Amino acid sequence: MTTNTKEANSPAAERVASGHSSGNAVAQALLDEFNRELLTTRDFLERIPESQLNWRPHDKSMTAGQLAFHMANVPAGVTRLSLADESPAPDFNAARQEAGSVHEILDSLDQSAAYVRQTLPTIDDERMRDTVKIVKDGRALISLPRGVFLRSLLLNHWYHHRGQLGVYLRLMGVSVPSCYGPSGDEPPRTLTA
């Protein structure tokens, strides 16, 4: 695995890590990571066979198409949620949207990514420290600084589902892309800034 220590040791990264950032360093750090990870996520989504969009590993699991469509829309959805100081919790029991095709999933990903790229730079570091709450029945399910909210619910949430999709691909007999190291099917990819 190749890592970019230059970026990890950059002045902007040090300011973000120490909590002494100014301007929109937090948004830029999140956006830099998002842009790098977008390529890998797209690679995973492109591998889903059209004929397997309705496949699921278990009755309680999302179909491959539902999972992929969710992954495509997480970036814009979470970014939108982060703009308000308080939002109602989504209905976790609502039916998941089905994807009609891999092309539809990739188009949704492109639109979602465009929204993130347009919106994140408008959130300055002061706003990144403000609290975002997700509330259900008068109780805060989530109460985090906006930057932490975005890190957790946009990026970490995305990686969680990408890992799920990797298992789906393996069980479908599809070659799994490398991510941070070899996948069993591919050597590690090179990570760069």
Residue ranges of predicted features:
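Short, charged, low-complexity loops and linkers
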Residues: S18-D32
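Solvent-exposed, charged/polar functional surfaces in cytosolic regulatory/catalytic domains
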Residues: T40-D43, R47, Q111, Y115-T122, ...
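Short, contiguous alpha-helical
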Residues: T2-E7, A12, L31-L45, Q52-A95, ...
